[in-house]
């Protein structure tokens, strides 16, 4: 009898223990599934520059580890969204200035992720090989040269049949890092431009019509006979628009290409804060209007977001650079990749960026 009672107790206790173990196992499994799903659902929101948008959108489409929504709004809107902490990261073709950085409570890490050129695309029927001197393209955007057969344009385009066609300048209508790059260059080469118009993401244009973002300007140029405007090279390429060879600091006429923009970047040394302004580069073969373009990161994120940010940057520095040239951008030099990786690796202690 005693043995039977003990067996019953053993059975009951064993059943209870099994039930408890099963319950703990289920809870642990469910919690693990929930945690795994939570990891998979990390989403990042970014906004800003339209200049690198085709490249970034390609990266984020191909990159499967993190869901990234990048909204191409223009650098001005991107910096504003980033400063107000409405996004997880921003993007700008012009590095943030000290007074802008001071407004960001979580700190700022600026990472140059690619580079490219600002070209002067045009729509002049029958003209595919156009050269523009520094003085001429400044005067076009000042509104002083008004016609395509102007003597100053003809003088540097011997043998080109320039039509009697009004020039229509097309510029950005939104806050734009591309505008910042272009007007900084014009201010560097022309005292008149610097005093009358100046530089910035938005300026008071002396002449012309506006278009939103790089693709909007490209569309306007394509639509307007006699149009000329400044856009990132890839947008001109996609729109099938010819671009002018521009006179550089050494006096040579240079078209935008992988080699000429690499020559420009080679003449520029990035400082420790990774902020560089390329207003009028040296070098006989340098293309005169080129820029790095930056992702803007906070110094502090919560655990999952910080890891996701580092994974996104790692992808951009590795696989992302391989498709840059295909879309008209310039892959980062290896020394720049290493510097960017080291800076980005400070964002999260839970992940280490590895370059391939």
Each model region followed by its residue ranges:
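N-terminal secretory signal peptides that target proteins for export/translocation
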Residues: 1-13
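Assembly/oligomerization scaffold segments
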Residues: 7, 27-28, 86
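Glycine-centered signal
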Residues: 12, 30, 35-37
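Bacterial N-terminal signal peptides
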Residues: 16-29
